[in-house]
């Protein structure tokens, strides 16, 4: 009895192994398809590692190498404006993969943002007070999901004037730098300038030269009133002048300004 049961179990196991062996084999020219990714897009279905004749071998870094060979598009400063009101306005679009909302700055009655966008077409939308809306006054496009977005086309030709002005500014700055860095004209030699002793130890004057022009020492014109003095220089104001002592009398003078008039006061003091 025990031997019969053992043989039956052994036979069932052997049959299962044979069935698995038959199921694991493939007919000539037949392969199972393996679906990878989303089933919404039939283009993502792929076969196992089967290579057709003439296929190229790609190394893992070849895609990065191809991307590095492509020239990078220059970013252009683009003004985005929202004029439909609101308290808080943000913007998001295909230029940042709709990942973040960029705030707009309020300027008078509008909201403005200056974004550095690469050349080409970009879709964008505004987030105003918690709702996604588009600007009806700007070009629009319907996305693949059926939503209406604004469309902007950044072209290089729109910035040719700014590029020309920038190039002209750079050239003018380089020219001015060359002019400043150039040496003054004239002969050059190897001899060092030697200071003379009187130049080295020259001391400043006791009295500044412009204070030597005292209006009381000047002669008065005959055609002028002798009580009127010529208009003094501004450096002569608020200084005290003294006349040489004669006949035991000292004379002091000072000139002051009151609005548009000048008053010279003389003080006589006996000694």
From Swiss-Prot:
The keyword Phosphoprotein applies. It comes from Mus musculus (Mouse). It comes from the Eukaryota. This is 5'-AMP-activated protein kinase subunit beta-2. One of its GO terms (molecular function) is AMP-activated protein kinase activity. SUPFAM superfamilies: AMPKBI-like, E set domains. Phosphorylated when associated with the catalytic subunit (PRKAA1 or PRKAA2). Phosphorylated by ULK1 and ULK2; leading to negatively regulate AMPK activity and suggesting the existence of a regulatory feedback loop between ULK1, ULK2 and AMPK. The modification Phosphothreonine is found at residues 39, 147. Non-catalytic subunit of AMP-activated protein kinase (AMPK), an energy sensor protein kinase that plays a key role in regulating cellular energy metabolism. In response to reduction of intracellular ATP levels, AMPK activates energy-producing pathways and inhibits energy-consuming processes: inhibits protein, carbohydrate and lipid biosynthesis, as well as cell growth and proliferation. AMPK acts via direct phosphorylation of metabolic enzymes, and by longer-term effects via phosphorylation of transcription regulators. GO terms for cellular component: cytosol; nucleoplasm; nucleotide-activated protein kinase complex. Residues 1-46 are annotated as: Disordered. The keyword Membrane does not apply. Keywords: Fatty acid biosynthesis, Fatty acid metabolism, Lipid biosynthesis, Lipid metabolism, Phosphoprotein. AMPK is a heterotrimer of an alpha catalytic subunit (PRKAA1 or PRKAA2), a beta (PRKAB1 or PRKAB2) and a gamma non-catalytic subunits (PRKAG1, PRKAG2 or PRKAG3). Belongs to the 5'-AMP-activated protein kinase beta subunit family. One of its GO terms (biological process) is fatty acid biosynthetic process. The modification Phosphoserine is found at residues 38, 68, 94, 107, 157, 169, 173, 183.
């Amino acid at each position: 009895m025990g031997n019969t049961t053992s043989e039956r179990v052994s036979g069932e196991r052997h049959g299962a192994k044979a069935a698995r062996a038959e199921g694991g084999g493939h007919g000539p020219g037949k392969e199972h398809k393996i679906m990878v990714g989303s089933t919404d897009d039939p283009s993502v279905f792929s076969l196992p590692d089967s290579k057709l004749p003439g296929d190229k071998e790609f190394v893992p870094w070849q895609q990065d190498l191809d991307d590095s060979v492509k020239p990078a598009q220059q970013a252009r400063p683009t003004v985005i404006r929202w004029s439909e009101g609101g308290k808080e306005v943000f913007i998001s679009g295909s230029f940042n993969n709709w990942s973040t909302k960029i705030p707009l700055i309020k300027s008078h009655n509008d909201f403005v943002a200056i974004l550095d966008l690469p050349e080409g077409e970009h879709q964008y939308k505004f987030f105003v007070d918690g709702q996604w809306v588009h600007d009806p006054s700007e070009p629009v496009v319907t996305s693949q999901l059926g939503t209406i977005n604004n469309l902007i086309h950044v072209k290089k030709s729109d910035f040719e004037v700014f590029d020309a002005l920038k190039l002209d500014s750079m050239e003018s700055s380089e020219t001015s730098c060359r002019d400043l860095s150039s040496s003054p004209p004239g002969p050059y030699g190897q001899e060092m300038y030697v200071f003379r002793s009187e130049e080295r130890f020259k001391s400043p004057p006791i009295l500044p030269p412009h204070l030597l022009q005292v209006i009381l020492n000047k002669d008065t014109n005959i055609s002028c009133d002798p009580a009127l003095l010529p208009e003094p220089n501004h450096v002569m104001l608020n200084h005290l002048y003294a006349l040489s002592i004669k006949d035991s009398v000292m004379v002091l003078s000072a000139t002051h300004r009151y609005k548009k008039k000048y008053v010279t006061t003389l003080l006589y003091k006996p000694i």
